[in-house]
Amino acid sequence: MGRGTLALGWAGAALLLLQMLAAAERSPRTPGGKAGVFADLSAQELKAVHSFLWSQKELKLEPSGTLTMAKNSVFLIEMLLPKKQHVLKFLDKGHRRPVREARAVIFFGAQEQPNVTEFAVGPLPTPRYMRDLPPRPGHQVSWASRPISKAEYALLSHKLQEATQPLRQFFRRTTGSSFGDCHEQCLTFTDVAPRGLASGQRRTWFILQRQMPGYFLHPTGLELLVDHGSTNAQDWTVEQVWYNGKFYRSPEELAQKYNDGEVDVVILEDPLAKGKDGESLPEPALFSFYQPRGDFAVTMHGPHVVQPQGPRYSLEGNRVMYGGWSFAFRLRSSSGLQILDVHFGGERIAYEVSVQEAVALYGGHTPAGMQTKYIDVGWGLGSVTHELAPDIDCPETATFLDALHHYDADGPVLYPRALCLFEMPTGVPLRRHFNSNFSGGFNFYAGLKGQVLVLRTTSTVYNYDYIWDFIFYPNGVMEAKMHATGYVHATFYTPEGLRYGTRLHTHLIGNMHTHLVNYRVDLDVAGTTNSFQTLQMELENITNPWSPRHRLVQPTLKQTRYSRERQAAFRFGQPLPKYLLITSPKENPWGHTRSYRLQLHSMADQVLPPGWQEERAVTWARYPLAVTRYRESELSSSSIYNQNDPWDPPVVFEEFLRNNENIEDEDLVAWVTVGFLHIPHSEDIPNTATPGNSVGFLLRPFNFFPEDPALASRDLVVVWPLENGSTYAQRWIPEEDQSCLKPPPFSYNGSYRPV
């Protein structure tokens, strides 16, 4: 539907405003008390929005599963966050609750000019109006930029089966499999993006693979380029074919050359282990599967997390309380986990910390390998939050939470146990000290247990699994972390492919790639009036004051304040100061500005040259850190459309910096990019392991408190030596219930001696 179709006149706009104001006055309470202002839509709300949209006859909606692109259908419904100023007035000043609205994305494929249009629908829970949500000024959402739907995948699968009919004998001989009518020996595919070479195109390379556990690691050597830009699937065509290092104009040409003996054929081995009589063993020993192989001596169960007196955190709706912490959360279907209204010690330190985007940028020798630049919000990053397994994905003691997504469906879909919340020991003390008497004994020992609260979810974007953690420490430190695991994106082995990756199996190249993740960090440090400054070390060379004949070199502190956005946008390749501070004009008792420090843990680097073709969709990836002034028009660094139209995306982060606004004593947002280069290696078979493949950042109080706020923790032990040679241990935790899980009595002897 064209945006002009539902344009409102001044009278209509006035009526809409009155409806919204009236709705705000009588908006019902939502789960989680005031935190409900951030809560994801309930199943009832999602259904109400869907029903309201269907009641608008001018939209001419059809079910999303209808197998045609020439239809109007709802693609996404999710909660639309109210404006920050309205939320803060509601939370802090007792103003009325903001209107609760949904964001609805509709694909209008039945229009003469197919398009994608977004609407705000409200008020919830009983919608009565809808209004346009236009893209940023100067941008549009092209029809070709929409994410691929299940219906489109079904049509593409049919097209691939149809187009490869001339290759049935070729497939049987080279792979032992086929498309369609294949029983247990089938072919499947992986599609890559961007889909084409210029804006408006929808031309996708497909990797054909053998269907079996871990099929991502079983390419057949055949890749096809399909043009599927038309709303009529009958018009879709296979434009090119690549097989084992050579290009062909069509499947028919490859089939003909194969029949003529002109194709360099690779016969793929049977991946299943064989018995003595040539029959497949009952349990396949697939290299791409998780089945144990090899021998470890340990066959006992490992340690478990226990909570003898139950959890020390509480959960009310979408509000979490833990020690000094309080925060709300939501699992946004489009982009993932958001932490909101973060308080510590009763004081807000952040309004929002959220995942914005995750990309994986590849190189390769095959056309699919060299084309792959995954921008994962375009693949439903926030909606692929599948079930978490107790004792593996999260401790058995965790609280598991379900999620609802209305994404490419005709109603809300329940994802059980999509999130988990748990406390765990870190295995490292938060702090400790052994105070030696330097005579074989000690004056005291003191230590504070390392305990953290973790909120976790995952995103399984086809081959890759991202584990998303927000971690809360008892000393006011918060950490955001991403762990990468799952299957590597792999292509067919050719000798030339070794320039772009590692040979992982007989016919397999693991393609090198860079993972980058972007976060939005809206810190409110002692209020919304903040500035940005850095601290660095500089060496000085001075005359030694107590020995003037000598020189002294020592570190000094260099403080830099930044007044403009461009100054605070640090590009990859330029030095990034170690101490990155969001500061308040308020001071702590010792005269220092109350601040929070950003500390990045990352091995990221610039991957694409600035301005190079698809790079326009990920301009945030130019900067490990950029600090901007808060604007309601700059809430996300990416969009669900950037993947499929990276050449003219509707969201270009670089534009956030173009006006170069003042950032002194303003409401500030930090945009953080972390990541790492992944050169696959044989130990990535069957899956990439998490150790060494985790990145993130810390938010650390820096002169924010007068002393360590973890002094309030009771997980402390202080041990004193007594004159009789024994020790006295002071503890502040409650006595544990008698049970088989009771740990042994605490003991400590601080002496040391030669032996």
From Swiss-Prot:
Post-translational modification: Topaquinone (TPQ) is generated by copper-dependent autoxidation of a specific tyrosyl residue.
Subcellular localization(s) per the UniProt record: Secreted, Extracellular space; Cell membrane
Pfam entry (one): Cu_amine_oxid
Activity regulation text: Inhibited by amiloride and amiloride analogs.
Stored Gene3D superfamilies: 3.10.450.40, Copper amine oxidase, catalytic domain
Keyword set, alphabetical order: Calcium, Cell membrane, Copper, Disulfide bond, Glycoprotein, Heparin-binding, Membrane, Metal-binding, Oxidoreductase, Secreted, Signal, TPQ
Reactions catalysed: histamine + O2 + H2O = imidazole-4-acetaldehyde + H2O2 + NH4(+); N(tau)-methylhistamine + O2 + H2O = 1-methylimidazole-4-acetaldehyde + H2O2 + NH4(+); putrescine + O2 + H2O = 4-aminobutanal + H2O2 + NH4(+); cadaverine + O2 + H2O = 5-aminopentanal + H2O2 + NH4(+)
Location of 2',4',5'-topaquinone modifications: Y464
Subcellular location, principal: secreted
The protein's name: Diamine oxidase [copper-containing]
The organism of origin for this protein: Sus scrofa (Pig)
Lineage: Eukaryota, Metazoa, Chordata, Craniata, Vertebrata
